[in-house]
Amino acid sequence: MLVKTSKLLGALFIVVASILSACSKSDNSANNKQSKTANTSSENAIIKIDGSSTVYTITETVAEEFQLATKVNVTVGISGTGGGFKKFCRGETDIQNASRPILEKEMVACKRAGIEYIELPIAYDSLTVVVNQRNNFLSSITVEELKKMWEPAAQGVIKTWAQVNPAWPNTPLKLFGAGSDSGTFNYFTKAIVGKAKSSRGDFTTSEDDNGLVQGVQSDKGGLAYFGYAYYVENQARLKVVPIVAVAG
């Protein structure tokens, strides 16, 4: 029985490979014909991965190396942590990338579907707030200022930078962030607004952080948050904003 997992670790692929190898050995003990069939099956095998965009960069790197070393194909999708768990608990994927632990309701869904899994923490990441490179007035930002931008009460009301801080220009504020199925969205809203999933809804969303990068890069008044790894990959095109306790 293939044991599924909720997070990806380099060693995880070794576990999966060992299971496939064990099947081949079993077939070899039966007869050569069955062994040949098993090997052909391994060559055509596909490991399906989905979930968090934050974990995507690590997963994609390991997947590429794994495919070079084996004949097993690996597909890596980005549906967000929540969206990925829905697929995982329906048995549509083999590995679930997550930027948070599995929720109780997701445990129940997996149990009902007969999905067994192991959870493997692989890394710690931090969220990064970025703006357009042409933004020449923002050297830092406070949690309160971010809250004023992102809280539900800001929807349809806070439309310019000056409305957040009078010292800032009257430039249109364009926000980019993770979708509601994302673990990143849950974490950011809880840390900044004070309650998970509590956010204005009139901003551009994407489960793929590359889309957020492109959005901020193309809009002078843009601001976004996403995993630090995506900032590192795109730091030549973006400006990172330190979060401070007091404005100044």
Which role does the model predict for each range below?
Residues 1-10:
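Bacterial N-terminal signal peptides that target proteins for export
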Residues 23-248:
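Flexible loop/hinge segments at secondary-structure junctions
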